[in-house]
């Protein structure tokens, strides 16, 4: 019998409960995020313990994001062609093996920074597929009226695990033994694979009934009959025609350059300016997570109250404020609060972005459209990680944060009117095909 994950007194499909299928997907996402968070914190600590070179530290972040540039797009095609549940199990199993090798090497004294880079590359290649498949499965098991709440739960669970729990835990485990965070990471991926295996049903888009193919994009296709490039072009061209989704994708790619750059050298800022050790550095991520948790709890109600338009606009201001704080403050408490506020913004932004994409995108294209967004975001992540080390080495540790502030202010000024109330209202109304058609280039949507 399906267990209840959450229920609110709503009408229509908004009153439908999120059942045990979503509960298992949420649990898998959360436990996997815990493991990924352990590696995210432990990797720069591992490199910094062996070399104080900012380039080597930021390179760990760059290597982690490089697979997103190489494999995000074909990964989306794969998600749209095969059973998403089975694919996620296979990927998690591969990640267990990779992290197990790294943990064993560190614990036996046979480690190297090069091996860490290789494992990060493999694990994050799998993360691409898992992220796209998981987002698509949310749309499979959750009715449209509950997407904001479901995405809030997914983001809240992942944020709690990856930052609130993983940060301090990784710092503690690293002090006990450098290989322990990576060993624990392998165990979480194994648990995730088991949980996904318990989800009932088939999740291959081509065999589901009610497959939606947008007008003008060709007749319904059979998986495998078209080339990967044709599938990629179909998903990309559809996204390009959707003004709102296209703008959000480009915007997050640009902002990720400065944000990832800021986070790539945060370990050095924490040590040199804030006087924090490994546990204190992890606590900064806990502040970020606390904000994310608050955002996930109040997200669907806050977005409904203040509107998606102002949720996004205020979030852009918060982003600018974060960079300014990191550039000027010497107080660990002020920095912690800034990260907390950014955590709230980050969760609210992601809820809006994911829910809009799941609403507007035809089911058979969710993998490709989602992976295209991930590719654009990853481009910014990788560029930011690569640039931050060089900028910090040349101009000082605060230089990446000043650059981030300037970019964030410029983005606020140039995109303020894009997220109008009329565009958002149209996106939340009607069927996915109708809403997407209304928001395509050429459709009337006055900015307000």
Give residue ranges: language-model regions.
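Alpha-helical transmembrane-bundle signature of multi-pass membrane transport and export proteins
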Residues: 1-448
